[in-house]
Amino acid sequence: MDRLLVLVRHGQSEWNLKNLFTGWRDPNLTDQGVSEARRAGALLAAEGLSFDVAYTSALTRAQRTCQLVLEEMGLTGLRTIADQALNERDYGDLSGLNKDDARAKFGEEQVHVWRRSYDISPPGGESLRDTVARVLPYFVQEILPSVLRGERTLVAAHGNSLRALVMVLERLSPEGIMKRELATGAPILYRLGADATVSEKRDILI
């Protein structure tokens, strides 16, 4: 049984390009982001991979990435489940602010703490711990059972929601996951054993 799980962060969004805190705001992909998503699909197809089900967030940039990946793989119309449990970390009052402007307004050290600490949230927003607490129940209840049934599964989501999955799959500490950067449009492949432990993990690169 092939217990395949592939994670891919959405391609570059319009707000990534503008260096804005995005969170639950809903910009679309840039042309580069579209290219990144298509490249991810082409890389997965070149590996001879296929999927039985895809999961994505409620946000356009992730859904569009998922659609483009599947198109490149010849899987248009694949069963795709969108849920806000997989949304990006909510940056609250920082959402829509340029990151340099936020540093000027709140101070560089404070913004660094909000971005890079595990359990401190910006005003009105989520910490990474909050994001993990939102994402993991959905993973355990919905996505993981799919994988363990042998359904080859794609998850197209966001840097921080995917960090939550990487954290549990790779058994990383909060400190370890904070150091982990996930590139846009770069697939990560996992194969799981019957006990849900990772038997294979690799980055799929050009």
From Swiss-Prot:
GO biological process, one term: gluconeogenesis
Catalytic activity: (2R)-2-phosphoglycerate = (2R)-3-phosphoglycerate
Keyword Isomerase: yes
Gene Ontology MF terms in the entry: phosphoglycerate mutase activity
UniProt KW Isomerase keyword: yes
Biochemical pathway: Carbohydrate degradation; glycolysis; pyruvate from D-glyceraldehyde 3-phosphate: step 3/5
Binding of substrate, residues: 9-16, 22-23, 61, 88-91, 99, 115-116, 159-160
UniProt xrefs under CDD domains: HP_PGM_like
InterPro entries: His_Pase_superF_clade-1 (IPR013078), His_PPase_superfam (IPR029033), PG/BPGM_mutase_AS (IPR001345), Phosphogly_mut1 (IPR005952)
Annotated keywords: Gluconeogenesis, Glycolysis, Isomerase
Active site per UniProt: 10, 88
Job description of the protein: Catalyzes the interconversion of 2-phosphoglycerate and 3-phosphoglycerate.
Family: Belongs to the phosphoglycerate mutase family. BPG-dependent PGAM subfamily.
Subunit comment: Homodimer.
Protein name as it appears in the record: 2,3-bisphosphoglycerate-dependent phosphoglycerate mutase
Biological source species: Azorhizobium caulinodans (strain ATCC 43989 / DSM 5975 / JCM 20966 / LMG 6465 / NBRC 14845 / NCIMB 13405 / ORS 571)
